């Protein structure tokens, strides 16, 4: 019991002496730097993905890619249209709606403002479309001070044929394989009787208006045009020249015939024969119903 109490009483003094000696030794061997402080770094690891990507994300990515491709295509188209516009060329190559009409009208007005003394070439390859949009283009063609030369290629049908005939007389042409079609405006009505009556009056107004415009473009009578547009009437370029809707056919580097435009010409004849002797094909004794 005495030994145990002696050792336990000596142990604290022994430990403190060892600590004092070690601290003094370390302080004497390694000088303590002043103001030494290490800033702890905080490691941030990305969260682990526990689920697969949503299909909606891939759908959005594909939509963005398609929109980018469409924007690139539209940009290329606008570049082409811009180059054509520098050459005073306007191209109508689609169905006619309000958006297309706004583009065509703005280009015509721009070119007319830049130089009203130079011709504007309006190329047409269109199946027609909205009558109101077509009337807007027609009015602008008549409004501009510059001569508008219309050139049909492919097809100029329905309301597009009105724009074709609206060009400056003597400067309305078509390519050899173009098809041209005129007809009366389409329309329909439903609902109450009074609504049907109102729509019917509007359709008749549009029909009379279109008939008057075609008669003015072709120098034909109102009654004759009214009869001709009762059904779809397709024409070749030569037949369109005969009808008075255009003034010549572009065949290579030549335009035939341009002057004079015969009033009565047999249809479906060789272009070269007409250019050599157009008077030979004049047949005033044949009535219109047999010619067309």
Swiss-Prot record:
Cleaves peptides in various proteins in a process that requires ATP hydrolysis. Has a chymotrypsin-like activity. Plays a major role in the degradation of misfolded proteins. Essential protein required for chloroplast development and integrity. Essential for Embryogenesis. The modification N-acetylserine is found at residue 66. This is ATP-dependent Clp protease proteolytic subunit 4, chloroplastic. Residues 1-65 form a transit peptide. It catalyses: Hydrolysis of proteins to small peptides in the presence of ATP and magnesium. alpha-casein is the usual test substrate. In the absence of ATP, only oligopeptides shorter than five residues are hydrolyzed (such as succinyl-Leu-Tyr-|-NHMec, and Leu-Tyr-Leu-|-Tyr-Trp, in which cleavage of the -Tyr-|-Leu- and -Tyr-|-Trp bonds also occurs). InterPro entries: ClpP (IPR001907), ClpP/crotonase-like_dom_sf (IPR029045), ClpP/TepA (IPR023562), ClpP_His_AS (IPR033135). It comes from Arabidopsis thaliana. Component of the chloroplastic Clp protease core complex which consist of at least 16 proteins: CLPP4 (3 copies), CLPP5 (3 copies), CLPR4 (2 copies), ClpP1 (1 copy), CLPP6 (1 copy), CLPR2 (1 copy), CLPT1 (1 copy), CLPT2 (1 copy) and 3 copies of CLPP3 and/or CLPR1 and/or CLPR3. Interacts with CHIP. The core complex is organized in two heptameric rings, one containing CLPP3,4,5,6 in a 1:2:3:1 ratio and the other CLPP1 and CLPR1,2,3,4 in a 3:1:1:1:1 ratio. The gene is CLPP4. One of its GO terms (biological process) is chloroplast organization. Keywords: Acetylation, Chloroplast, Hydrolase, Plastid, Protease, Serine protease, Transit peptide, Ubl conjugation. Its main location: plastid. Disruption phenotype: Embryo lethal when homozygous. GO terms for molecular function: ATP-dependent peptidase activity; serine-type endopeptidase activity. Ubiquitinated by CHIP. Gene3D superfamilies: 2-enoyl-CoA Hydratase, Chain A, domain 1. The active site is at 158 (nucleophile), 183. It comes from the Eukaryota. Induction: Repressed in darkness. Levels decrease in leaves during aging (at protein level). Slightly and transiently repressed by high light stress (at protein level). Pfam families: CLP_protease (PF00574). Its EC number is 3.4.21.92.
